A protein has these predicted regions:
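Glycine-rich phosphate/diphosphate-binding loop of Rossmann-like nucleotide-binding domains
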Residues: 1
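Anionic-ligand binding patches
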Residues: 5-144
């Protein structure tokens, strides 16, 4: 765990992943002659940008004029003792090991459903990230 604390996992790494997804989506759409007004992506990951290990979702929305907006979901903490395992594998595998395998968690509900006792799901976190990303679009020039 000492080795893990030396590593700085910035939230920008998650943003880069989400931006790459949008870039690839736009390329796919162009290659397959698919027209869209907006291109959306979401990326989830672990970071310690606040000095604590957290899982955060970042949504990126880009239009055809390369105007981009992004938003984040609420983040939730990862215990220090589990952070290194999450970095080496992924959150789902660590949760399987700690909480037991659960097919519901691997579908729409996500591990956050278990951690919040059914108060929040993966869909909720994804929705919040996209709503935050949409603020630049729904407010026009006022918020750009």
């Amino acid at each position: 765990n000492t080795e893990c604390k030396k590593i700085v996992w910035k939230i920008s790494f998650i943003l880069i992943g989400a931006k790459n997804r949008v870039k690839n989506l736009k390329l796919y759409a162009e290659k397959n002659n698919i027209k869209a007004d907006l291109y959306l992506s979401i990326e989830s990951g672990i970071n310690n940008s606040l000095g604590r290990w957290m899982i955060t979702n970042i949504a990126v929305i880009e239009d055809n004029f390369d105007f981009e907006s992004y938003g984040t979901s609420p983040s939730f903490p990862v215990p220090d003792r589990l952070a290194e395992d999450v970095i080496r594998t992924d959150l789902s595998q660590v949760m399987d090991k700690v909480l037991g395998e659960d097919k519901e968690r691997h579908n729409q509900k996500g591990g956050i459903q278990l951690l919040t006792h059914n108060k929040v799901t993966r869909v909720d976190l994804t929705e919040m990230a996209f709503i935050m990303a949409l603020t630049k679009y729904i407010n026009g020039d006022t918020w750009k």
